[in-house]
Design a protein with these regions (language model features):
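Carbohydrate-binding surfaces of carbohydrate-active enzymes
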Residues: 8, 26-217
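Single conserved hydrophobic/aromatic residue that forms the stacking wall/gate
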Residues: 1-11
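Short, well-ordered beta-to-alpha junction loops that form the rim of enzyme active sites
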Residues: 13-15, 163
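Distinct, well-ordered alpha-helical segments
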Residues: 15-26
Length: 217
């Protein structure tokens, strides 16, 4: 429990876990954030949808708390990001409403469960690596923007309802099929608009629908 004395403390959360209604929880949060760790075969539209969900939780810009500049741990393949991939993913994050781009981790671990996770500074310990140069380049580009993009809002014509009650009803029951996954179904709707370059807001069931030309439920 955080006391009233800690009024200057910023409260945030991260992730997209099934067990908690994020729209309800976001009302108690100061800032919404999440960690973007796609697999080598994760569709770009899936990443974009999660960005839009994070933005939609408070209808405000969010924070990207973590991404790896290179390879990432705890997946089937700890694949290394190709040249330019991290930069492209970072700009995708900004385009979908993020105010920050942050990395985990700064320096490569020498042990522990994330010893194979990527880092800005590799074991070689200097700046003479492709990954370090790419991060430095991105930092310089973002610095050149100043504060022009901070607090900016996305104007979407489509509202796509993401409802945790339906999420739970579908996946916490024994039917109609274990292969029917809520997020995958929502992504199919989202992907249609993504491929046509149509902006989407991920919204709760009690959102104001009148601002949208189309609401998908």
């Amino acid at each position: 429990l955080l006391s009233r004395r800690q009024r200057q403390m910023c409260i945030r959360d991260r992730g997209t876990f099934k067990g908690l209604d994020y729209f309800k929880w976001a009302k108690e949060m100061d800032v919404v954030s999440w960690d973007n760790y796609p697999s080598y075969d994760t569709p770009w539209s899936s990443i974009a949808m999660t960005h839009d969900l994070m933005r939609g939780l408070k209808d405000e810009p969010f924070m990207l708390m973590e991404q790896t500049p290179s390879q990432q741990n705890w997946q089937k393949y700890n694949s290394l990001k190709r040249p330019g991939q991290m930069r492209a993913q970072s700009y995708q994050t900004l385009a979908h409403g993020a105010d920050t781009i942050q990395f985990f981790q700064l320096r490569r671990s020498v042990g522990g469960c994330e010893k194979f996770h990527g880092a800005v500074i590799a074991h070689v310990g200097n700046e003479n690596t492709r990954v370090f140069r790419e991060v430095a380049q991105l930092g310089a580009e973002l610095e050149s923007f100043g504060d022009r993009t901070l607090g900016s809002r996305n104007e979407a014509e489509v509202g796509l309802i993401f409802d945790w009650d339906n999420y739970w009803a579908l996946e916490y029951t024994s039917g109609p099929s274990e292969d029917l996954k809520y997020v995958d179904q929502i992504h199919q709707y989202y992907q249609y608009f993504y491929k046509k370059n149509i902006g989407v807001d991920m919204i709760p069931v009690d959102a104001v629908f009148s601002k949208y030309k189309i609401v998908v439920a």
